[in-house]
Amino acid sequence: MQREITRELVRRLLPGRMAESNKGSYGSVLAAAGSMAYRGAAALCTEGALRGGAGLVYLASVEPVIQLVLSRTPECCACGCRTAANGGIHPQDADALRRWFADRHAVLLAGPGLGESAADVCKALLGRNAPWAGAVLDADALNALAAGKYRGDLPANTILTPHPGEAARLLGLTVPEVQADREGAAVSLAEKYHCVAVLKGHHTLVAAPGGTVWRNETGNAGLAKGGSGDILAGLTAGLLAAGLKQGRTPEDAAVCAVWLHGAAADRCAKRRSMTAMLPGDLFEDLGWILGELER
């Protein structure tokens, strides 16, 4: 049976901001994102992680992507990487990143805009004894996982954020089969990968290991544009990083993220229209929604 995500539920589950705190109190995120072909994805997901409340957000990417992101979001910390032949992060640099983050207990956000480098990057960053406090896997990281390009030994506190096409590849189904039983698909993802699964779409579903399924009623067709998912992935990672510091769960982070993302889109559509709104417009509305919840 599906449970509805409500405003009051999100208000209770959101990580709080404490007077006696510092940036270390709210966790950190390493976003392995972006490539020469997909630079904007890194900008959107890193800002999403910061807006989601993470104390520190690091971006690992190639230098042109780093330059773009820092010009837009100087609050982000840079981990510049060499460019591989495919335009993405060089796998040797991904190995170095894993070692550098070994004792930092960061949340890994992998996938947005990684392109063809995703398989090598995820193989280097994930696998047995990965150092991450949690992980959010999206986009190209999900496709690499579905193709068996890296081990399925995912860190504890992992969240997958597939759209129906990615979910179909992860489960070995067709998209019509996923859409015909979205709840069953979400539960199967959570059980197969031992993680929280966010099945995006009209009325996004959040499934946790054990069978609990949450249904989100916020959001609209204005989100059907490239970049919306990058923001959701970043927002989820930021909420996960901050929440783990306060005893929250990956399920809590995913539930809050999908509701906030959709609620921001609903407010944005009233300002911009569903047709004209852009994913980047959501940040203004997200701040307004969070402000209402904090009061």
Predicted regions and their residues:
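Small-residue (G/A/S/T)-rich helix-start motifs and N-terminal tracts that mark the onset
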Residues: 1-134, 143-159, 164-295
